[in-house]
A protein has these predicted regions:
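Ser/Thr/Gly/Pro-rich, low-complexity flexible regions
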Residues: 1, 5-193
């Protein structure tokens, strides 16, 4: 079974006619999905921000970004994405592991960039902060080693109603050292410079 394959089947209840209930019928459909065990170390090392809607809005010369990630030694099931979009601004993401069929990621409100770097001017308290969008689910795949993240940005210190920048979609995929080296040689925007 490949990483994203599932197996579906229809089961037929075999019983005496008098024990059948019309309300429920005698068939049920079952779908088995492949689930890989969670290992936090699958999400450390080189990672490629494959795409981000933020790039199109504020980093027009960037289509992908190579970063490094490491396991947070102080928080369970959490990684630190070093220099995520801007140098000196790391982002922490926590992986939920209580339901492997619903593998979600969580992110607390945290600094994302300086307003000068992001917008070429000073706004509010001079920093852009990022938090997990409350409207959409962000998730991960241990089998495919990626996260799909909805991230909402805001600027503290701005007047109420004018502090939110927007919600952006990021897709981050972990790559091998060899793949990272090829990306570096190809000139992919990277935080490792």
């Amino acid at each position: 079974i490949e990483v994203t394959d599932s197996l579906g089947m229809v089961l037929q209840l075999v019983s005496k006619e008098e024990s059948k209930w019309e309300l429920y019928g005698t068939e049920t459909k079952v779908i088995l999905e492949k689930v890989c065990p969670f290992d936090i170390h699958l999400f450390e090392g080189y990672a490629l921000i494959v795409t981000s809607t933020y790039f199109g809005s504020y980093m027009k010369d960037v289509s992908q970004r190579l970063i490094r990630t490491k396991v947070d030694p102080n928080a369970e099931n959490t990684i630190i994405m070093k220099d995520y979009f801007y140098k000196g601004y790391d982002l922490k993401v926590k992986f939920t592991t209580n339901d492997l069929l619903n593998p979600l990621i969580e992110m607390e409100d945290q600094p994302f960039a300086s307003t000068m770097e992001a917008f070429d001017t000073i706004y509010g308290d001079w920093e852009v902060w990022a938090y997990q969008s409350g409207y959409y689910l962000s998730y991960y795949s241990s089998c495919e080693r990626f996260i799909f993240q909805y991230m909402t940005l805001h600027v503290p210190g701005m007047p109420a109603g004018k502090d939110e920048v927007g919600t952006y979609i990021n897709v981050v995929k972990w790559v091998s050292d060899d793949e990272a080296q090829i990306l570096i040689e190809e000139g992919v925007n990277n935080s490792l410079k």
